[in-house]
Design a protein with these regions (language model features):
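Extended alpha-helical interface modules used as scaffolds for assembling large macromolecular complexes
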Residues: 1-327
């Protein structure tokens, strides 16, 4: 990485974009991304990338499009401004000159000259930042060899527009959540259907995505693999899902509440009332084992519960078969 590309990256990331997460408008979820500039990764990389292409990139626009095929990145081809890079070089050169001179004994007049040069350089940097912003605002956006449209010439809005398309294309199973995200405050309610926190309409929205979680658990079980909460989270936060952590916790909790799976921590089978605390504690995720719940004859369970409520005078006997057995 050259000094010039390093400085251009700092301007793009720190002065133009100023964030490492972009909100998906359809569900309000923040998606992190990594930065790239001319094929060079800068900083920590994520599943998604915003890849800036500078005027010095050695490939043609058509080649740039072709090279983007099959990649989970938004390519931002900066509008060509030959002076940006030459002015960046001058900026760096002047900074070095001032720094070197300040380390020596200089006269009062030389000091004034350096001060003037420094002020000019500060102005040059501000002007450069504005020009880079304008270049991003007029950039060509490319995802998977196809151009993406945006009507905005605001740098961040334009990149955000392109990123919306990248999220939609990468996380094709995000639609199972139907534009919703759930919060950690809803985990307890999902595990306890009688709590009334989810009405029938809300609960029905959880059905399709929770069945996807159940299918994942059953597939892993069939392969003889132990499934932990961490296993589920790692798989479903990644593509093609892109689901957020709290929503996954709510879906696991909902499966427990509907007696589809059980949660065991350190060998202890958890009651529904204990589930939320374990799921919300990410440090427990690697030790929290999710298993398909054994199915029971519903008529026998109902009869046994009736026996408990009527014969044993226990109106609050649990509905879950396993909890009823332990009651």
């Amino acid at each position: 990485m050259t000094e010039v590309s390093g400085r251009l990256f700092r301007i793009l990331s720190g002065d133009v974009i100023k964030t490492s997460k972009i909100r998906y408008a359809k569900n309000g979820q923040d998606f992190p991304f990594g930065f790239k500039l001319d094929d060079q990764a800068h900083g920590s990389q994520k599943e998604l990338s915003v890849h800036f292409i500078s005027p010095e990139y050695p490939y043609s626009p058509e080649e740039i499009r072709m090279h983007s095929a099959g990649k989970d990145e938004l390519r931002v081809i900066l509008e060509s401004d030959a002076r940006v890079l030459s002015d960046l070089r001058l900026l760096i050169k002047t900074e070095k000159y001032i720094k070197r001179k300040q380390g020596t004994s200089i006269s009062a007049i030389e000091g004034q000259i350096l001060q003037t040069k420094g002020a000019q350089n500060t102005g040059r940097e501000k002007e450069l930042i504005e020009r880079v912003k304008a270049s991003v605002g007029k950039s060509t956006l490319v995802i998977n060899a196809a151009d993406i449209s945006s009507s905005s010439q605001d740098a961040l809005v334009r990149v955000t527009d392109g990123f919306q398309e990248l999220i939609s294309r990468t996380y094709t199973q995000l639609k199972l959540l139907d534009g919703r995200t759930y919060s950690e405050q809803q985990v307890a309610g999902a595990a306890n259907p009688d709590s009334g926190l989810f009405d029938a309409a809300e609960a029905s929205k959880l059905f399709a995505p929770s069945e996807e979680v159940l299918s994942f658990v059953l597939r892993k079980e069939a392969l003889g693999e132990q499934v932990t909460v961490k296993t589920i989270v790692d798989s479903l936060t990644a593509k093609p899902y892109g689901w957020d952590l709290a929503s996954i916790e709510v879906l696991i909790s909902f499966l427990i509440g509907t007696s589809k799976v059980t949660l065991t921590v350190d060998g202890n089978l958890l009651k529904r009332s204990e589930v939320a605390t374990a799921l919300r504690n990410t440090q427990k995720h690697a030790h929290a084992v999710v298993s398909p719940q054994k199915t029971f004859d519903e008529r026998r369970v109902a009869a046994f519960r009736k026996f408990c409520t009527d014969g044993c005078d226990e109106p609050n006997a649990p509905k879950d078969p396993l909890e009823l057995a332990r009651h």
